[in-house]
């Protein structure tokens, strides 16, 4: 086993995991679109998001200092949790490059650290497409990696598209005074995902190793139209309409995945 790095004082590295999760839906009528927004707004209100983030705190081994949460009118919610590190020695499972736990395997230590989540429901004014975006940031200062929370969070939301960024900033010193700008090995965010997640998504990496900057984009491979319909659309669409809606939804997902408008 690789020996642990002996530090001089506190580990001053800041590790930040930022990711955006998109859930896509089609509703046939304006009323159904509004009903979807209301449904998703209630499903992921501030109370539910607080519970999810509290689980994240448990996963990364942190101590909650303060929670601030807010539901917004007409829709949306946000939660911020301040966390602090306890003086413990991390286990190998906390720092090694491997997937974190799934929602049903959750088992409750970071100065200047926080977790935030914001939700953004959105409706296309013409095409009947609604998107629900969740932005989550997990920032830790110390030895614990926020990447351990990634696997759990992807399984907590209906994730059609996921964009993940991970960066390490600052430096810490060993007992001989030498600077270390990262304290763990990593070559891809994908290594922190479980096998079933890697199999379910088309993924692409853009990594800048010399800058300790890692980026992964994920697009769900399997497309089952029934999983994307809401309201009357689940029973009233003709075969031709279903083909048209399928094309619209796939086009919408590709535009979000590639972050650019694409010709139809």
UniProtKB/Swiss-Prot annotation:
Pathway: Amine and polyamine biosynthesis; S-adenosylmethioninamine biosynthesis; S-adenosylmethioninamine from S-adenosyl-L-methionine: step 1/1. Belongs to the prokaryotic AdoMetDC family. Type 2 subfamily. Heterooctamer of four alpha and four beta chains arranged as a tetramer of alpha/beta heterodimers. This is S-adenosylmethionine decarboxylase proenzyme. Catalyzes the decarboxylation of S-adenosylmethionine to S-adenosylmethioninamine (dcAdoMet), the propylamine donor required for the synthesis of the polyamines spermine and spermidine from the diamine putrescine. One of its GO terms (biological process) is spermidine biosynthetic process. It catalyses: S-adenosyl-L-methionine + H(+) = S-adenosyl 3-(methylsulfanyl)propylamine + CO2. The gene is speD. The keyword S-adenosyl-L-methionine applies. It comes from Pseudomonas aeruginosa (strain UCBPP-PA14). Its cofactor is pyruvate. One of its GO terms (cellular component) is cytosol. The keyword Aminoacyl-tRNA synthetase does not apply. Keywords: Autocatalytic cleavage, Decarboxylase, Lyase, Polyamine biosynthesis, Pyruvate, S-adenosyl-L-methionine, Schiff base, Spermidine biosynthesis, Zymogen. The modification Pyruvic acid (Ser) is found at residue 113. The active site is at 113 (schiff-base intermediate with substrate), 118 (proton acceptor), 141 (proton donor). GO terms for molecular function: adenosylmethionine decarboxylase activity. Its EC number is 4.1.1.50. SUPFAM superfamilies: S-adenosylmethionine decarboxylase (SSF56276). Binds 1 pyruvoyl group covalently per subunit. InterPro entries: AdoMetDC_fam_prok, S-AdoMet_deCO2ase_bac, S-AdoMet_deCO2ase_core. The record marks 112-113 as: Cleavage (non-hydrolytic). Is synthesized initially as an inactive proenzyme. Formation of the active enzyme involves a self-maturation process in which the active site pyruvoyl group is generated from an internal serine residue via an autocatalytic post-translational modification. Two non-identical subunits are generated from the proenzyme in this reaction, and the pyruvate is formed at the N-terminus of the alpha chain, which is derived from the carboxyl end of the proenzyme.
């Amino acid at each position: 086993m690789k020996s642990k790095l002996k530090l001089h004082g506190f580990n001053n590295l800041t590790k930040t995991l930022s990711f955006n999760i998109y859930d896509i839906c089609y509703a046939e009528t304006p009323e159904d679109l509004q009903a979807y927004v209301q449904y998703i707004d209630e499903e992921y209100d501030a109370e539910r998001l607080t519970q999810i983030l509290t689980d994240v705190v448990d996963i990364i081994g942190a101590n909650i200092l303060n929670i601030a949460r807010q539901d917004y009118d007409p829709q949306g919610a946000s939660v911020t949790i301040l966390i602090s590190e306890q003086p413990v020695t991390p286990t190998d499972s906390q720092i090694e490059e491997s997937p974190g736990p799934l929602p049903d395997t959750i088992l409750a230590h970071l100065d200047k650290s926080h977790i935030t989540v914001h939700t953004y429901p959105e409706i296309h004014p013409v095409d009947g497409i609604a998107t629900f975006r969740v932005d989550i940031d997990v920032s830790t200062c110390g030895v614990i990696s926020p990447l351990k929370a990634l696997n759990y969070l992807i399984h907590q939301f209906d994730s059609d598209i996921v964009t993940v960024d991970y960066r390490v900033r600052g430096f810490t010193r060993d007992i001989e005074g030498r600077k270390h700008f990262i304290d763990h090995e990593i070559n891809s965010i994908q290594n922190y995902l479980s096998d079933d997640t890697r199999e379910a998504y088309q993924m692409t990496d853009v990594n800048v190793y010399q800058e300790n900057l890692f980026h992964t984009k994920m697009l769900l491979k399997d497309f089952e139209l029934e999983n994307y319909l809401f309201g009357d659309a689940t029973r009233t669409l003709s075969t031709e309409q279903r083909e048209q809606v399928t094309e619209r939804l796939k086009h919408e997902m590709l535009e979000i995945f590639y972050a650019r408008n694409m010709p139809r």
